[in-house]
Amino acid sequence: MTITNTVNLTTELDLPAYLFGITMLLIVMLVHGFVLLQIAKRYEVKSFLYLSEQKYSSVALVFYISILCLFLTHLFEIILWGISLRVFNLLPNLGQSILFSGSTYTAMGFMDDSLPNGWKMLAIIIAFSGMFAFAWTASVMISMTKNFRQAYTLLHMQKLKLPTEVIERFK
């Protein structure tokens, strides 16, 4: 087997894409996990305090701010993928790199596969990173809704002027 055959085999199997993709997937998931846990921790503490202080509208505000932060986390990860594609000169410009990353990360696939030969598998790895990140985010959002729903219900109980003993039983 000659060097040319080895290079062709490496390219045909997309080995550089696997190595680069798995490394980036790990980096993206580490960033995602760190930021996600920070958002969740801050939401849980603040919403618990606001519930205990009967500041039910503040719980909703913190909930929506947390959702915005989760969204921004995903945007950051798409940009991180885009920058990495551009740094490795896999796409012609940063804008196209970010757009391609977003298209694959969200699994929407609205862009053509413009990656060079030997790097095609990278699109699938980016899609997996997005699926993993969205699943993790969804699980955190589900846990966040408990305090949000409790605050929402308590706020409406107060607006309906239900007796205090009824409201206290709900807590």
Per-range role (PLM):
Residues L72-F100:
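Outer-pore turret/helix-boundary of cation channels
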Residues R149-K171:
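Short, highly charged, low-complexity non-transmembrane loops/tails of multi-pass membrane proteins
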Residues T23-H32, Q96-S101, F110-Y152:
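Pore domain of cation channels
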Residues V31-S47:
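Membrane-water interface of transmembrane alpha-helices
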Residues E44-S57:
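Membrane interface segments of multi-pass transport proteins and intramembrane proteases
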Residues Q54-F63, T104-G118:
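Short membrane-interface loop/juxtamembrane segments of multi-pass integral membrane proteins
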Residues M1-P16:
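Short, strongly hydrophobic alpha-helical membrane anchors
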